Swiss-Prot record:
It is an enzyme of class 4 (lyase). HAMAP family: LeuC_type1 (MF_01026). It comes from Cupriavidus pinatubonensis (strain JMP 134 / LMG 1197). Pathway: Amino-acid biosynthesis; L-leucine biosynthesis; L-leucine from 3-methyl-2-oxobutanoate: step 2/4. This is 3-isopropylmalate dehydratase large subunit. One of its GO terms (biological process) is L-leucine biosynthetic process.
Amino acid sequence: MAKTLYDKLWDDHTVHVEEDGTTLLYIDRHLLHEVTSPQAFEGLKIAERPVWRISANLAVSDHNVPTTDRSEGIADPVSKLQVDTLDANCDSFGITQFKMNDHRQGIVHVIGPEQGATLPGMTVVCGDSHTSTHGAFGALAHGIGTSEVEHVLATQTLLGKKAKNMLVKVEGKLPRGCTAKDIVLAIIGKIGTAGGTGYTIEFAGSAIRDLTMEGRMTVCNMAIEAGARAGLVAVDNVTLEYVKGRPYAPQGVEWDQAVAYWSTLHSDAGASFDQVIELRAEDIRPQVTWGTSPEMVVSIEDRVPDPEKEKDPTRRNAMERALEYMNLQPNVPMESINVDKVFIGSCTNSRIEDMRAAAWVVQKLGRKVASNVKLAMVVPGSGLVKEQAEREGLDKVFKAAGFEWREPGCSMCLAMNADRLEPGERCASTSNRNFEGRQGAGGRTHLVSPAMAAAAAIEGHFVDIRKLG
């Protein structure tokens, strides 16, 4: 019987199935950070349970760490407590951790892949919804809650019910100036933030195959914004070349054995999907969100939508509320919207290719950050990304243009550290969520690609980067 990639991964990790379909899955890799792990470790201590498989775990502090000078530590007492608690718990239980001043430290969904801790065919979980990122490797990856974090630490298994299969095919060649971020925003704009609810999405088609691993990670990262719990891309030579030689990757005979298995990690011909969505890459344009949900997105050449043209009353009300919060008027050209701050970073877009794309735009425009932009910041996803960017001189490009070059961390993606928006400030952001208050109380977030964010910083407003040549 022909199987989808999701079917294969699920079946390969099934330990036991109850009569109602509840399945006990084996978990290969567990990633931890400081926000969702303290209560889980406390539960282990109270029950006097050990960590079942210490080597399956990898931890890092990312949400609360400062992205400015770290020599003076963490100023906020709550943030400091969370980071210190993770340090103490990992030391106590013997779990490998990249602490704040380790040059390998970074965002958990960046360091996992770059260390080779994320491998094809794995089940990967983390107490973070954007664990879907790791599905780019043909791994079944999704976020879990704190009680489940404790369960995985104690048993290396997890209970769940199988989702339905969705295939999203993007065929054709992506136009110049468009990126993986534009692909996934266009997908979400098409199916909505509830379109993937109850599904695991496999992303396929020639436009997906043409993406680098970093691009595929961007797409899978935002599967959760489409309502899905997980996103997947089949394994191919691009996957294998990325993984080979990384610290956690198998070597020698074990590598050959792994590749033999990994090469089977694709949907079989004739495999049945519960739903199929198709897009043409040629139709995708640089995307910008205008509202307070990732599905509220248009191309840069469009105007802010008019709620009066929406027939569905529920959607119309949501649009009206979003426009009020964002302080935007219908029919305003997207290119005329000014920005106050620019954030290039997050687990969606903080890898070396993102840094290069943004730096290229800065060099191409050849000017400094616009006078109306209060802050433009670039936050690498890890210490290794930062080091690579500095070897290439990208930091000098940014700093010369007036951008701030920061230390790695989640930063302004969420208002959980010192990097945040003030009420009423408008931000061009390469992150993944534009909910009310996501980047700070009263802050207004527009999701874009790194190139689009860099251009907005220089021009002071959104621009169509296809015009740059």
